[in-house]
Amino acid sequence: MLQKPRGRGRPSTQADPERDWGGAGEEGPSTSRAAGGSSQGSRASLSAPTVGPRTQKQLELKVAELVQFLLIKDQKKIPIKRTDILKHVVGDYRDVYPNLLKLAAERLQYVFGYKLVELEPKSHSYILINMLEPVEADAEMRGDQGTPISGLLMIVLGLIFMKGNTITETEVWDFLRRLGVYPTKKHLIFGDPKKLITEDFVRQRYLEYRRIPHTDPVDYELQWGPRTNLETSKMKVLKFVAKVHNQDPKDWPTQYCEALADEESRARPATASAPATSS
């Protein structure tokens, strides 16, 4: 089971492990502003009575899902169609779509450094503009070929870590389907997603992929590979997950403690092997 985040000020409700990486928890007031209004105003409109039985937590999770979807779709710099957003993410939340998009735009800009821009009013398509310096953008999350792994791979790494460092392939696809990524369908950006995750990422040593014995139907499990441990860390991945949910990494106490221990173990050999300076 995923660990639910610790709420700020009052206990958070139990997160559905099929819906996110561990829940969005409670948030404090935001000072960031989006185009057309303040973040606080947008949050208030999400809480309006028109949303019926939906809870604030459900709406926050939908915003997080939309942010992930936009980040993935932007990988090939092809305009993101509103029809795809409505089909793959928004679903029956169409009545609050403008506010969901506004909050997602705020999070993309103030957390990830991307500005969500509508190409033309009549085109109903969007692009993300990188507001950061090219050298700084995703600097900690690039592979040896300069490709950011903060897209699909980063999401898979986050799923693995938040599920206790091992996740079944079935659980991965249950999550990715909500982002419009299917194991049996060719994807515009990723080509063959199943091959990318279970073969390419495995061959590059970002992931380990093993069959789970005595399962019917047959299932597989995924874990971090040795290259992941060299190029990133549990703390960086946890911070990525926290950014998507607009939370603090400490809101997941179990994972945060594990990430801290990982940071300490990484620093220890470097300290021990540091050459002594002569006086």
From Swiss-Prot:
Modification sites for Phosphoserine: 38
Distribution of this protein across tissues and organs: Ubiquitous.
UniProt KW keywords: Chromosome, Cytoplasm, DNA damage, DNA recombination, DNA repair, Growth regulation, Nucleus, Phosphoprotein, Telomere, Tumor antigen, Ubl conjugation pathway
Disulphide connectivity of cysteines: none
Top-level taxon of the source organism: Eukaryota
Biased composition (Low complexity): 30-48
PROSITE patterns the UniProt entry points to: MAGE (PS50838)
A single Gene Ontology CC term: chromosome, telomeric region
Matches recorded under InterPro entries: MAGE, MAGE_WH1, MAGE_WH2, MHD_dom
An example molecular function term from Gene Ontology annotations: protein dimerization activity
GO BP annotations, alphabetical order: cellular response to hydroxyurea; cellular response to radiation; cellular response to UV; DNA recombination; DNA repair; positive regulation of protein ubiquitination; regulation of DNA-templated transcription
Region annotation (Interaction with NSMCE1) ranges: 52-279
Assembly, per entry: Component of the SMC5-SMC6 complex which consists at least of SMC5, SMC6, NSMCE2, NSMCE1, NSMCE4A or EID3 and NSMCE3. NSMCE1, NSMCE4A or EID3 and NSMCE3 probably form a subcomplex that bridges the head domains of the SMC5:SMC6 heterodimer. Interacts with PJA1. Interacts with E2F1 (via C-terminus). Interacts with NGFR (via C-terminus). Interacts with NSMCE1. Interacts with NSMCE4. Interacts with SMC6. Interacts with EID3.
UniProt xrefs under PANTHER family: MELANOMA-ASSOCIATED ANTIGEN MAGE ANTIGEN, NON-STRUCTURAL MAINTENANCE OF CHROMOSOMES ELEMENT 3 HOMOLOG
Protein name as annotated: Non-structural maintenance of chromosomes element 3 homolog
Organism: Mus musculus (Mouse)
